[in-house]
Amino acid sequence: MLLITPDELKSYSVFESVKTRPDELLKQDILEATADIILKVGHDFSDAEYIPLPETVRLALLKLSQFYALINGDESIIKGYTTEKIGDYSYTLGDGSSLQKPDVYALIKDYVKPADPDLEGIEAKVRMRSI
């Protein structure tokens, strides 16, 4: 379920690498960001009260999606190199250390659902045996 579109992400971002990234890859980045937000808030924004999607949640999704698009699109991070030399030509690539995952908690904190109070205080015992 996409809560934002690749076109919305492209118009939000100032990074050329995000704007030129194929829509199919941006959809994967958006899904990754959506899964991250759902994990933090405890629901998937499918209830009628979240239509339209709150602006702060939308902004959080845009920020995280842009982050994932930048990380997933940076070949130098995956390959693990920072400099490369070809003949007389050399260049330096980012190592990802300056790119940090944005903290979007302040944007989504109003939408975090508390744990089910019926589950509090329940004990469970698990028996395990070695194989």
Swiss-Prot record:
<comment type="subunit">
    <text>Monomer.</text>
</comment>
<protein>
    <recommendedName>
        <fullName>Uncharacterized protein YqbG</fullName>
    </recommendedName>
</protein>
<dbReference type="Pfam" id="PF11436">
    <property type="entry name" value="DUF3199"/>
</dbReference>
<dbReference type="InterPro" id="IPR036558">
    <property type="entry name" value="YqbG-like_sf"/>
</dbReference>
<dbReference type="InterPro" id="IPR013514">
    <property type="entry name" value="DUF3199_YqbG"/>
</dbReference>
